[in-house]
Regions:
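Rossmann-fold dinucleotide-binding core
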Residues: 15, 110-167
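Short beta-strand/turn micro-motifs at beta-sheet edges
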Residues: 18, 63, 93, 135-138
Length: 167
């Protein structure tokens, strides 16, 4: 049985999603239903982002900078190391623009080395990063019963624990 989450507590976060395929979209739906504020979604396939944005009542960002600018917490659900490094690139459109005080929860299937690079890049701009490796499927993403293996600083984990509990 999924843990009951207090909706009042959930309003303190403004959450953005990068990667709204089957996993990311279902994670966004789940958080929205549990009372979290999902402010924006982004996908390289804009039609997919627009569809989920309309469904859950948020914005479909056209740039990664827009996601960071409108979110306290950004959850990334992309496919591989190359995609992850691309969304956190040092130049051009990137989640690192205006990222000071943003917390990133990276749920992508990527190598440990890439997680370390991303954490260093985030910290360099005043942001925080948490690794949130998933060992579950689409149904668990939708139902809020994901198995997440988290890595990162305890203070970052504690800050976003209500989100992690809901996922």
């Amino acid at each position: 049985m999924a843990k009951k989450i207090s909706k009042a507590k959930n309003k303190s976060f403004s959450i953005g999603f990068v990667g709204t395929g089957r996993m990311g979209a279902n994670m966004a739906r789940n958080l929205k239903e549990k009372g979290f504020t999902v402010s924006t979604v982004f996908d390289t396939k804009q039609n997919i982002a627009k569809k989920i944005a309309k469904e859950i009542g948020c914005t479909a960002s056209k740039t990664l900078k827009e996601v960071t600018s409108s979110s306290d917490v950004v959850i990334t659900v992309v496919t591989d190391d190359k995609s992850m490094l691309n969304i956190y690139k040092k130049k051009g459109d990137s989640l690192l623009i205006d990222a000071k005080n943003t917390t990133f929860i990276n749920c992508a299937t990527i190598s440990p080395d890439t997680h370390i690079k991303i954490e260093k890049r985030a910290e360099a701009v005043g942001a925080k990063s948490l690794e949130g490796c998933m060992a579950s499927s689409i149904d668990q993403a939708r139902n809020g019963t994901l198995y997440l293996m988290c890595g990162g600083k305890r203070s970052v984990f504690n800050k976003v624990k209500p989100i992690l509990d809901a996922l």
